[in-house]
Swiss-Prot record:
One of the record's GO molecular function terms: complement binding
UPAR/Ly6 domain: residues covered: 26-108
Residue ranges of the propeptide: 103-128
Entry annotated with the keyword Disulfide bond: yes
Functional description taken from the UniProt entry: Potent inhibitor of the complement membrane attack complex (MAC) action, which protects self-cells from damage during complement activation. Acts by binding to the beta-haipins of C8 (C8A and C8B) components of the assembling MAC, forming an intermolecular beta-sheet that prevents incorporation of the multiple copies of C9 required for complete formation of the osmolytic pore.
Name of the protein in its database record: CD59 glycoprotein
Record-annotated disulphide pairs: C28-C51, C31-C38, C44-C64, C70-C88, C89-C94
Glycan-bearing residues: N43
Assigned keywords, A-Z: Cell membrane, Disulfide bond, Glycoprotein, GPI-anchor, Lipoprotein, Membrane, Secreted, Signal
Membrane topology, as annotated: Lipid-anchor; GPI-anchor
PROSITE patterns reported for this sequence: LY6_UPAR (PS00983)
Posttranslational mods: N- and O-glycosylated.
Entry-linked Gene3D superfamilies: CD59
């Protein structure tokens, strides 16, 4: 494949990446006070790209979160809890109690589709 074919492939991958971006804000369950059964859904503000559910003993926190802060140290510091389980996800209303119990998943379907597309494109480029 020549330079022109590589440019076309890059352009197609760029278009795919743009279309994979949903264009709407993420919806998460969000309860200002810890509860065991949060049913309040909100549209997350700009910059909050992840839903969080965290459990510290009997306290369960559901809220919009920043993926960059989805680690034990940041979560425990911001929630002021020293021991907790947590789960971050990037799909609408994905932060419900069963996610902590089942272990959940961390990759969205869009992410998987994009990764598979990139792998297939790379394999196609490397094929003689």
């Amino acid at each position: 494949m020549g330079i022109q074919g590589g440019s076309v492939l890059f352009g197609l991958l760029l278009v795919l990446a743009v279309f994979c971006h949903s264009g709407h804000s993420l919806q998460c369950y969000n309860c200002p006070n810890p509860t065991t059964d949060c049913k309040t859904a909100i549209n997350c503000s700009s910059g909050f790209d992840t839903c969080l559910i965290a459990r510290a003993g009997l306290q369960v926190y559901n809220q919009c979160w920043k993926f960059a802060n989805c680690n034990f140290n940041d979560i425990s510091t911001l929630l002021k809890e020293s021991e907790l389980q947590y789960f971050c996800c990037k799909k609408d209303l994905c932060n419900f109690n069963e996610q902590l119990e089942n272990g959940g998943t961390s990759l969205s379907e869009k992410t998987v589709v994009l990764l598979v597309t990139l792998l297939l494109a790379a394999a196609w480029c490397l094929h003689p």
